[in-house]
Regions:
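Long amphipathic alpha-helical coiled-coil segments
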Residues: 26-29, 33-38, 70-103
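Extended alpha-helical coiled-coil "stalk/arm" regions
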Residues: 27-57
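Short, glycine/alanine-rich amphipathic alpha-helical segment
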Residues: 49-78
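Short, charge-rich amphipathic alpha-helices with coiled-coil/heptad character
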Residues: 1-20
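Short acidic DE-rich linear segments
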Residues: 2-3, 105-110
Length: 110
């Protein structure tokens, strides 16, 4: 399968269009991971349990904490998916560059 100039341009445009989205996805994941610690502390403080283990069990089984974990999972999925799509676009461009250089070398030798 030969990669055309149009394919390389589409790959470049994809990277350009999605770079900000990837940055936001990464920031969202980082924020949620940091907030998870705060949420754990808030829920532990809210607990009526007397032991630390009891407070932690209450907090980690709380629906808000579980919802936050699901949010982190979704944010990480979005980030990783975009990262691999970006890597694929970069590889497409590199293959096009290599094929173009090879074709120029063949043309010179003829």
């Amino acid at each position: 399968m030969e990669i055309t100039k149009d394919d390389a341009i589409k790959a470049r445009d994809f990277i350009w269009k999605n770079s900000k989205i990837l940055g936001q996805a990464s920031a969202d994941r980082s924020y949620l991971e940091a907030f998870l610690k705060s949420k754990l502390a808030l829920l532990m403080a809210e607990s009526t349990e007397t032991t630390m283990a009891g407070k932690e069990m209450y907090a980690k089984s709380h629906p808000d904490y579980i919802a936050l974990l699901h949010g982190i999972k979704e944010a990480q999925n979005q980030e990783v998916t975009l990262k691999w799509q970006m890597d694929s676009a970069k590889i497409t461009i590199e293959i096009y560059r290599t094929e173009s250089a090879n074709n120029r070398a063949i043309d010179k030798s003829m």
